[in-house]
Amino acid sequence: MDIRRTVLWMIFSFSLLLLWNNWQIHNGKPSLFGGPAPEAAATQQPKADANGTAASSTASIPSSPAAAPAAASVPGAAAPAAAKSEQVVITTDVLRLTFDSNGAQLIRAELLKYPSSSQSDKPTVLMDRSADLVYVAQTGVVGAPQGESFPTHQTPFHLVSSERSLTGDTLDVVFEAESGGLKVTKTYTLHRGRYDVDVRHAMANTGGAPLSPALYLQLERDGTDPAGTSSFYHTFTGVAVYSEQDKFQKVTFSDIEKKKGTYIKQADNGWIGIVQHYFATAWIPAQGKQRTNELLQVQQNLYAARTIEAVGTIAPGSSANVDAHLWVGPQDQKAMAAVAPGLELVVDYGWLTIIAKPLFTLMTWLHGLLGNWGWTIVALTVIIKAVFFPLAAASYRSMARMKQVAPRLQALKEKYGDDRQKLNQAMMEMYRTEKINPLGGCLPMVVQIPVFIALYWVLLASVEMRGAPWILWVHDLSVRDPFFILPAIMMATMFLQIKLNPTPPDPVQAKVMMIMPLVFGGMMFFFPAGLVLYWCVNNTLSIAQQWTITRNLERQAAAAANR
């Protein structure tokens, strides 16, 4: 059996499989590797009111959890009459947040340090309440006595604080509302240079009877893909739930709609959030308190992810405080890990996380030294080549020796003709005599495939690559090369590598070898420039290494022949 030919066919088939997988995703079908298909944008956006904002729905207000026995189900009560709202714009050094006084809810979030992918002179809009996108953060209190209602995200609040721009290290944005004998003071505390917002709900019982409220923290979003989403490769947009028990769980909007999402319903730890490419939002309640997680479809193409916890009984004249954190920003792993356990897992590297995590850690360290992500990729490639050097050197020696015995292989083919069994036996006998491993020449490529895929996920999922330039025409390593120069270089280096290798005796095998650069190069036209840069540098180093080893073996063979 010709083992080398079998391996080459495996590599070629793997390449075709990757192309077919990307084509499936491009056409909105599920990934062959188990990932969900991209969420198709619904043909109908959530219904809007006269102002163009998303209409309120009593379905978006939860019932209180079972832990509050005196609570009544709010959806059965009449929704409060809409009041004229005030939009409050708050600015820090990294965020511009817009709050609606109706519900004291966050209705727009702009990330000032991250330019928009379509308009570089404007910041990325992560959250908004408009005709194009509905993505908001809401809170409220449920569990009022029958016929009453506590302040929810549909209740008019009034702004108490006056400062709207961060001048010191922190800025408090304070709203108040009173309903059903409960006064709720909602305080958002923003910090300089941070994307996590402290949120405190102070609840005071202003009535004459004990109250048992429950607080809900909620994110609402439509199922539309973020602007700039690639139609060629898939990135996840949907809900994420984390707990110490079940760890990181992802749920697509389509699964929420079909009511078949798998996630933890009861927990006293963790967080709940919404994830998209490079960015995320998440509610992180105080740890150690029992709560209920809910994912539901509010209306057509509008989904809610929320967590509800009982506050406990508040006696007349008494008060209670409930603290939480709200993350609104990039998927910065270091910053997220400092805010909540497991929050950094929103950066999902897939099934090769065990390789991708160390690669990202090494890249971060190298970037601290070099200050440029492009040169960081180059340096990382050199390190990877150094790690694989012993294996690669042995493989290139094997290929060089295969090239030396190529005339003998051709002679064997002519001798045995179509008798494949005798030909293979003669070839294997020659390999044993010459101490050649026919599989050795393929090992470097096979071994590097997991590293290649892991690095692909690192470059695709890490927000640090977004907008990161290299040199000259490469202004963003996270998107494809605008002039396709790197893919062309990659194809050229692959062709050169093939020329350095021994010509396969089988014509079909030789054709497969010549097609492979076109297959891989065609794939790279749509891949991030950073990934193609890695492959180009890797190929260049491989060529230099292979040429050096081959020349040394040729010199040794010539010297032996002259003795």
From Swiss-Prot:
It is a multi-pass membrane protein. One of its GO terms (molecular function) is membrane insertase activity. GO terms for cellular component: plasma membrane. This is Membrane protein insertase YidC. The keyword Lyase does not apply. Residues 54-70 have a biased composition (Low complexity). GO terms for biological process: protein insertion into membrane; protein transport. Its main location: membrane. Pfam families: 60KD_IMP, YidC_periplas. The keyword Aminoacyl-tRNA synthetase does not apply. Interacts with the Sec translocase complex via SecD. Specifically interacts with transmembrane segments of nascent integral membrane proteins during membrane integration. Required for the insertion and/or proper folding and/or complex formation of integral membrane proteins into the membrane. Involved in integration of membrane proteins that insert both dependently and independently of the Sec translocase complex, as well as at least some lipoproteins. Aids folding of multispanning membrane proteins. Residues 36-70 are annotated as: Disordered. The gene is yidC.
